[in-house]
Structure formats: structure tokens, C-alpha cells
Amino acid sequence: MQLSPQEKDKLMIFTAALLAEKRKEKGIKLNYPEAVAYISAAILEGAREGKTVAELMSYGRTVLNQNEVMEGISEMIEEVQVEATFPDGTKLVTVHNPIIIKENDLAE
């Protein structure tokens, strides 16, 4: 199977996201690469499902919360950028501050 560098990147993101999903389901807090992969995969899937760039920029901020990542990770991830394939071509989706820190999250 011959894959382009972009296709290899997407497969690596997907693989890391699957691992992150399994850990999240077990209640294990995600580290930096797992959190970025999890958010990135959600954006890539959303693009394949037909969501717009604007919808994905909003959606990307709802995928993970403060309690699902290790301490300090939400502050480390200032933005996530993903090149996603849409029906009209490839576009860069940027999600700023994807893991929002909420007071009620800290109490859980």
C-alpha cells in the first residue's frame, strides 16, 4: 500500500486517538499527545461527516474537558491545527483553547 505523507499522518493521528479513547473510557487522564490526537481525530471525522470549518472550530472545544486530561495539559494546548478534507478541498481548521477550564470542572 502506497500512502502519501499526509495519509500517513492521518493514520498516526487515528491510531493515537484510538489509544486515547480507550484510556479515556477507562478513566485514565490523557497526556499531551493523546489529547491532541483525540481532538484532531474528532475534527477529521467531523469534516468527513460534512461539518463546516466554523462548526468544527466550535466542536473542537467540546471534545475534552479539564477532568479528562492530566494536570497542566489544558494550559499547554493553546491551539490545535488540523488539515482536514472537505467536499470542496483541504482546509486548515484551527481550534483555539480546545480544553476550556471551568470552575465546575475543577470541583469534579
From Swiss-Prot:
Which superkingdom is the protein from? Bacteria
Indicate the enzyme's highest-level EC class. Answer: hydrolase
Which pathway does it take part in?
Nitrogen metabolism; urea degradation; CO(2) and NH(3) from urea (urease route): step 1/1
One of the GO biological process terms: urea catabolic process
Q: Can you supply one Gene Ontology CC term for this chain's record?
A: cytoplasm
Its subcellular locations are: Cytoplasm
Is Protein transport set as a keyword in this record?
Answer: no
Q: What GO molecular function annotations does the UniProt record carry, in alphabetical order?
A: nickel cation binding; urease activity
- In which family does this protein belong, per the annotation? Belongs to the urease gamma subunit family.
Assembly and partners are described as: Heterotrimer of UreA (gamma), UreB (beta) and UreC (alpha) subunits. Three heterotrimers associate to form the active enzyme.
HAMAP family this protein is in?
A: Urease_gamma
- Please give the name of this protein: Urease subunit gamma
Query: What is the originating organism of this protein?
Result: Trichodesmium erythraeum (strain IMS101)
